[in-house]
Amino acid sequence: MARAEIVSHEPATGAEVWRGKVGDVEEVVARARRAWPAWAAQPLATRIELVRRFANEVRKDADNLATMISRETGKPLWEARTEVDSVVNKVEISIRAYADRTSQRKLDSALQGTAALRHKPHGVLAVLGPYNFPAHLPNGHIVPALIAGNAVVFKPSEKTPATGEMLAQCFHRAGIPAAVVQVLIGGPEEGQALVAHDGIDGVLFTGSAHAGIAINRKLASNPGKIVALEMGGNNPIVVWDTPKIEDAATLIVQSAFTSAGQRCTAARRLIIKASMFDEVIDHVKRLADRIIVGAPFDDPAPFMGPVIDNRTADGLTESFVYLLSSGGRPIKHMVRLQEDRPFLSPAIIDVTAVADRPDVELFGPLLQVVRVDDFDEAIAEANNTRFGLSASLIGGDPQDYNRFWANIRAGVVNWNRPTNGASSAAPFGGVGLSGNHRPSAYYAADYCAYPVASTEVDQPRASIGVGLRSD
């Protein structure tokens, strides 16, 4: 029986990008398990040298990789190039993080001998990647996993398999054995089989809350399998007292509409002091009206491209209509710019009057606005979500920011900066439906190896001082 195929298409044109056979989960995992012991036995210095060679391979192939990212995701070429840069930069960050978080340590001990802390790799880790950053985000799991001595089975999103293949080829050209980094092509069925496979020692996931919760439930009875979930957000950006209205508007637009709103840290909700509403919204709308929406390689370069596919675009337009029918007031309508392709104009809607605002991640260029009268109300509204990934305060004074930081429930909290664009040199993750307290980026080293505490003496020496009869 012939194996099914996965086909990826350009969001911008509908043209076929890539096709390939669906992988065999059993074969891929068995190959990884056979390869893992030899990889784990390599000296750390060797593994580090090989991931550095990987960074060099990415540099050499940067133009081709960026072009493929743009074709498969629809993001502008300038943005795809920044993603490739992030892939390269992640290597040295991961090396530093491994040394900082999981290096061998001697510990104080009241006992004779030595107390030590060392780390061991888990074994074979499954990395499940998203489509919005199909190289950078899975790479942020793969590189730390390899440094720690794990083998990796990488399942890219079925919407961006070609980028996943190109990334894996860079690892292989660097000298990392093909069985140590494998790509599993497939859809949700293959992903579920991989997660549940007994030969997988851990799952490192980036994607939607819906899929992450399903993984968590599936593995609830298997506590020995490490699970790191980086999920989405219903992120607030709060605008308070500031005279710098143009800068505030720019930060709002960057937060909401970069990557066509397809970032887990994108601002979904603008919470604004009522007395500032008219002036701020006027500036935001005028700036949003100037946004160029276009294909990845257009000239002049677009600010944002299409969303990933027509189904996603349909869902976003339906969500906008739902908010309108529920009492929302349109500030800037969402428009389908091309009937048969998923190009959407950035949309802004005042939902202050909507009684039951949906607490979901609307993964696209749709910004909801809520007016409030005092700062405590702003904080309460910002926290009015099951998610907890990113939040920003624009304006206010240091005392306001201290209150904001202390009371906001999120893993990333910024002041006068966008909600997106987090540093890879810091931990990255959220709480609630945004993650399971295993932040990625700098702290990825923590879940790629487990700690082993030891007390050690070079010769056995022992005595029992009490509780024994005399000879």
From Swiss-Prot:
Q: What is its EC number?
A: 1.2.1.71
Say if the entry is tagged with keyword Oxidoreductase: yes
Q: Which reaction does it catalyse?
A: N-succinyl-L-glutamate 5-semialdehyde + NAD(+) + H2O = N-succinyl-L-glutamate + NADH + 2 H(+)
Repressor listed as a keyword: no
Give the record's GO biological process terms: arginine catabolic process to glutamate; arginine catabolic process to succinate
CDD domains hit by this protein:
ALDH_SGSD_AstD
Q: Which superkingdom heads the taxonomic lineage of this protein's source?
A: Bacteria
Q: Which family does it belong to?
A: Belongs to the aldehyde dehydrogenase family. AstD subfamily.
Q: What is this protein called?
A: N-succinylglutamate 5-semialdehyde dehydrogenase
Q: What gene, per UniProt, encodes this protein?
A: astD
